[in-house]
A protein has these predicted regions:
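C-terminal motif of bacterial Sec signal peptides marking the signal peptidase cleavage site
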Residues: 17-18
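Bacterial N-terminal signal peptides that target proteins for export
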Residues: 1-9
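Signature of exported/secreted
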Residues: 23-301
Length: 301
């Protein structure tokens, strides 16, 4: 059982800094301001949001290529709670393949046995996980004691689980809600992608590119790219995002491209695709993550 390939699947379908500040925004004051689009955080109530997620990691080392792919289905519910929202997410199905061959993993059993719960503020800010120890309890039901169980226990440790959940939520949604967004407007967050025994760090730049009609309604379109350094003449908002994240060392030469669609009106993570490429310790890594909302279903009573 290896936790690594499933890192991005745990969290909140909904994957950035480990702090709770909103991501800074920037738009040139000298440019004419186009019509704005407002995103309010209005989750669907009494509905189950089903998403499919896919993460593909490939690494070239010593002339060989290893490819791992994770596919999973998440089901998410939102309930009003204490002036905010309780998010509850289950992972009823997950699948890992390595070089095209399915690999049995006890991690899938753990994910299927507990529901991840997070408390969000009224404006969509991530506050904390609720009862994160449920993950380790599920692990004890699945994994026998031993060295590998110890690795998984650390992976599902409440503090580590909350850090990953917070980062994944914020890298996708921090700074987008309760604000008027205009085309060309940019925001920045620091993201980390685990690769082997190391990680890739970069500043993710999100640029508002307008709106698009989708089967799930109108959505705001965000173009995604990453920066491997903070330029000397960087906007204050970009520098602030890096400082807020603790001034991490960014991975030289990292590149990425992608797109994210967030529904207008009620909260709907329509889709997201991001491909990250980096060379770490002489190994060439490519990590692609994709998520797509399949729709809402009325919750059974």
């Amino acid at each position: 059982m290896r936790p690594g390939p499933l890192t991005s699947s745990l969290l909140l379908s909904l994957t950035a800094t480990a702090c709770s500040h909103k991501a800074p925004l920037s738009v040139s004051p000298s440019e004419p301001r186009p019509a704005s689009v407002r995103l309010d955080f209005q989750p669907p109530v009494d509905r189950v949001l089903t998403e499919t997620q896919r993460s593909v990691r490939s690494v070239e080392r010593r002339g060989d290529t290893l490819r791992e792919e994770v596919e999973l289905t998440t089901q998410t519910r939102f309930t009003p709670s204490e002036g905010g929202w309780l998010l509850a997410q289950a992972v009823p199905r997950s699948r890992l393949t390595r070089n095209g061959q399915e690999v049995p993993t006890g991690v899938a059993d753990v994910l299927a046995r507990f529901t991840l719960q997070a408390w969000l503020a009224a404006d969509g800010t991530f506050v904390k996980l609720v009862a994160p120890e449920a993950a380790q309890e599920a692990l004890r039901q699945v994994a026998p004691a031993g060295t590998e169980a110890g690795v998984l226990e650390r992976f599902f440790e409440p503090e580590a689980l909350e850090t990953r959940a917070r980062r994944e939520w914020e890298v996708k949604f921090a700074g987008l809600f309760q604000r008027n967004l205009v085309e060309g407007q940019q925001s920045w967050v620091v993201d980390l992608v685990p690769v082997g025994d190391s990680q890739v760090a970069y500043v993710l730049e999100r640029t508002v590119q307008g709106t698009r009609d989708t089967p799930l309604g109108d959505a705001v379109v965000l173009g995604l790219r990453c920066l491997d350094a903070v330029p000397e003449d960087a906007p204050d908002a970009l520098s602030e995002a890096w400082v807020m994240a603790g001034r991490p060392e960014l991975t030289p030469g990292v590149s990425c491209e992608g797109e994210q669609l967030v529904g207008q009106g009620r909260f709907m993570p329509v889709s997201r695709q991001l491909t990250v490429r980096a060379t770490v310790a002489g190994e060439a890594w490519t990590v692609t993550t994709e998520s797509r909302a399949e729709g809402l279903q009325e919750e059974a009573r």
